Amino acid sequence: LECKDLGISIDDDNNRRLAVKEGDPLVVQFVNADREGN
């Protein structure tokens, strides 16, 4: 495994995404929690 640029971005809906930049920008959403009740 090579070292890759990793970044975590949080959008307005409080969804956390792991952004992996490997050639083409690739965004993997690993948290999608609807928190309407909170």
Curated annotation (Swiss-Prot):
The family annotation for this protein states: Belongs to the protease inhibitor I3 (leguminous Kunitz-type inhibitor) family.
Q: Which UniProt keywords apply?
A: Disulfide bond, Protease inhibitor, Serine protease inhibitor
Domain of life of the organism in this record? Eukaryota
Coiled-coil parts of chain: none
The beginning of the lineage is: Eukaryota, Viridiplantae, Streptophyta, Embryophyta, Tracheophyta
How is this protein named in the record? Trypsin inhibitor DE5 beta chain
Q: Does the keyword Ribonucleoprotein apply?
A: no
State the protein's purpose: Inhibition of trypsin.
Q: Which GO terms describe its molecular function?
A: serine-type endopeptidase inhibitor activity
Q: How does it assemble?
A: Heterodimer of an alpha and a beta chain linked by a disulfide bond.
